[in-house]
Amino acid sequence: MTMGFVGLCRARSKLKRKPKGFMKNEIGIHEGIKTVGVDNYCDFSSSSDLCICVVTWNMNGQVSYEDIEELVGRDRKFHLLVVGLQEAPRNNISRLLQAALVESHILLGKAIMQSVQLYVFGLKNSELFIKELKMDKYAAGGCGGLIRRKKGAVAIRINYNGTLMVFISCHLSAHTRNVEERNSQFRNISDSLFSKIWNPFSRPAQITIWLGDLNYRLQGINAFPARSLIQENLHKLLTGKDQLLQEAERGQIFSGYCEGTLAFKPTYKYDIGSNSYDTSNKVRVPSWTDRILFKIEDGDKINATLHSYESIDTIRNSDHKPVKAHLCLQVNK
């Protein structure tokens, strides 16, 4: 069976060798996910070869230019800005993003599969540093309704100034009970992306970043106890109920990946137009459905520092809050 680039990375993670010192501020290790702390200070100096801002947002079929501006932020010093969207409306999101970033960044590449979308922007003139740019997608069902809830993933493989990266924006199956279905979708996406262009002489990605509505929920706790902990700013105590971390600890998904500490509140499900959790009859348990995870494959050559991992609570036009990460790389060539 032909194995894609991402699948190759996942297979390589089974090797016993573990690179040392490639990720600063390591806090704890699950079987599959390494939890890392945040170094809040970044001066965008020459000490970092590549600073990447990564944003994911389930839009719930709604968009405004004001939300797009808030999504990309006011700090425009990043070398790359990666935006992953789920349940994106039929509007020309690419045009809105380019308008918001017109003074600082240009669109380098995009991958779109209906409502699942991915955009990579770079500083002006950064197209000169692109040595490879490929797109791929994997469909896993869904699509109906006005919101077009397509499930699956889109991906961009990019060689930026000699650093080979893969970005994956995904939307996995919903509902607490569908853990195994999400696990299976993760594996299928990993094995399928870029498999048609794979050959034994190709380099695997040096860094792979997954972002999206992974839809893993809190399990083993009801809505009201969970909300009570959140209201008391004790939501960190809920991480032990998080299906994503549980499944990673079982070795089912995201082996070898890193994620920042879940210091922000669960990002789903909110009443639209507010910062209040779901008041409908369903009374859903708040969950960290929206995540950003990354894997450094070449630990001898890349040192990574996570400078932020947070939700954007000022955006209220969806039942999800966007999540943003700021990751800087030092590359030893």
What is each residue range found by the language model?
Residues 45-47, 57-61, 76, 85-90, ...:
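Amphipathic alpha-helical protein-protein interaction segments
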Residues 1-119, 178, 186, 249, ...:
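N-terminal, active-site-proximal structural segment of metallo-dependent hydrolase catalytic domains
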